[in-house]
């Protein structure tokens, strides 16, 4: 009998901006919070979970080496359930969901959790010479946050890869700025309409005047204008460059998690799933143009699902940069109205290891809100990869 994976709950935190409301909250704590809430919403006991997989990229403290396990146990999952932390860079959160789903498909368990947690605000500085080499004189530090934003093969910033994509796919500065502005418009409208309320679990922390509750995405510029965008100078290529701080994604902090179940088990429990996982796909591309990774990954996922682009109702294609987001939409022939209807990485933010899980939660809630059938979740990955997954509302 063929096994099917359904998502029975999905939650996320609000997304904090760099050095913002979540800068003092460890990613393991954010992970535990979303695990606990996802279990509660799914009406599933932590004793029933057979596997947990979490995405994380930048380790900020010793606990992060075991982030998946810490998030699981502190989130209420039985200590008997194994847990795994995965790093597929920007695709880590979605990879965690795929990997957790695979444990169900393989028959290892009937209940699994996939998610991601990241705190770019807490990224450490590495002192490579501190243990053995710093006997005399000055010693340098390596910014691990910036390290995650550089291509490991060509030692170039991801912004340069976006410039390469812009040139190859003829994406102008004006197109990028307009796309960035539209991202802020959509995110602002979604927040004001309350579209995210049901998917966000508040983060409560101690402040000098008592508890402080963080429950609203804070990276969005609600008053952004096209003039704001056009005034910014290119950051990565000074002469004839097009990528700016305004049309690139943010540096952010957040977490998200989904509870998945074998379909027959969900039916036995009388649960109403958000969606079923239809297919997924991975692909490798030239690292110098990593932003185009969603194109081949999406084609693989569509082929496995037996679907066409026209069948998709909601598309979450992460905006690492407006240049690559526009190129992906162009290359796949996507309907811009269906792509990131409530904003994406530029406006809401891109907490790298968590983003894949975040946009999955966003996609599933939006799919149910608009009563669509199919949703695509896809993203580019530093180092030259792409990942995609397709879900069906049932």
From Swiss-Prot:
Q: Does the entry feature the keyword tRNA processing, yes or no?
A: no
Key word Transport present in the record?
Answer: no
List the Pfam families hit by this protein, alphabetically: Thiolase_C, Thiolase_N
Reactions catalysed, as given in the entry: an acyl-CoA + acetyl-CoA = a 3-oxoacyl-CoA + CoA; 2 acetyl-CoA = acetoacetyl-CoA + CoA
Matching entries from Gene3D superfamilies are given as:
3.40.47.10
InterPro entries in alphabetical order:
Thiolase, Thiolase-like, Thiolase-like_BktB, Thiolase_acyl_enz_int_AS, Thiolase_AS, Thiolase_C, Thiolase_N
Reported EC number(s) for this entry are 2.3.1.16, 2.3.1.9
User: Gene deleted: what happens?
Assistant: Mutants are impaired in their ability to produce PHBV when grown on propionate.
The alphabetized UniProt keywords are: Acyltransferase, Transferase
State the active site.
Answer: 90, 350, 380
Q: Which GO terms describe its molecular function?
A: acetyl-CoA C-acetyltransferase activity
| Function description | Required for efficient production of poly(beta-hydroxybutyrate-co-beta-hydroxyvalerate) (PHBV). Catalyzes the condensation of acetyl-CoA and propionyl-CoA to form beta-ketovaleryl-CoA, and the condensation of two acetyl-CoA molecules to form acetoacetyl-CoA.
Q: Which family does it belong to?
A: Belongs to the thiolase-like superfamily. Thiolase family.
* UniProt name for this protein: Beta-ketothiolase BktB
């Amino acid at each position: 009998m063929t096994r099917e994976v359904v998502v029975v709950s999905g939650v996320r935190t609000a997304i904090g901006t760099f050095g913002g409301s979540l800068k003092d909250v460890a990613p393991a704590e954010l992970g535990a919070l979303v695990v606990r809430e996802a279990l509660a919403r799914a009406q599933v006991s932590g004793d029933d979970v057979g596997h947990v997989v979490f995405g994380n990229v930048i380790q900020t403290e010793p606990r992060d080496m075991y982030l998946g396990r810490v998030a699981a146990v502190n989130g209420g999952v039985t200590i008997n359930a194994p847990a795994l932390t995965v790093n597929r860079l920007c695709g880590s959160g979605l990879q965690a969901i795929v990997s957790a789903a695979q444990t169900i498909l393989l028959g290892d368990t009937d209940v699994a959790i996939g998610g991601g947690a990241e705190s770019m605000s807490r990224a450490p500085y590495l002192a490579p010479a501190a243990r053995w080499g710093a006997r005399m004189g000055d010693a340098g530090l390596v910014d691990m946050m910036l390290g995650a934003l550089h291509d490991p093969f060509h030692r170039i910033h991801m912004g340069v890869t976006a410039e390469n994509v812009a040139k190859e796919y003829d994406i102008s500065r004006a197109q990028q700025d307009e796309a960035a502005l539209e991202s802020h418009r959509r995110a602002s409208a979604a927040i004001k309409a309350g579209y995210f309320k049901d998917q966000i679990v508040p983060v409560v922390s101690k402040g000098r005047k008592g508890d402080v509750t963080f429950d609203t995405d804070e990276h969005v510029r609600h008053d952004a204008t096209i003039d704001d965008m056009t005034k910014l100078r290119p950051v990565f290529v000074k002469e004839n460059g097009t990528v700016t701080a305004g049309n690139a994604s943010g540096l952010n902090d957040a977490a998200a998690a989904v509870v998945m179940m074998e379909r027959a088990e969900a039916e036995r429990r009388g649960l109403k799933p958000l969606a079923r996982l239809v297919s997924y796909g991975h692909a490798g591309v030239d690292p110098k143009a990593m932003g185009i990774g969603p194109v081949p990954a999406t084609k693989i996922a569509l082929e496995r699902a037996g679907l066409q682009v026209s069948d998709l109702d909601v598309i979450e294609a992460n905006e690492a940069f407006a240049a690559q987001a526009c190129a992906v939409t162009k290359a796949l022939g996507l309907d811009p109205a269906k792509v990131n209807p409530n904003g994406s990485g530029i406006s809401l933010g891109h907490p790298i290891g968590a983003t894949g899980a975040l946009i999955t939660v966003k996609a599933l809630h939006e799919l149910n809100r608009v009563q669509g059938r199919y949703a695509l979740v896809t993203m580019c990955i530093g180092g030259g990869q792409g990942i995609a997954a397709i879900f069906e509302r049932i």
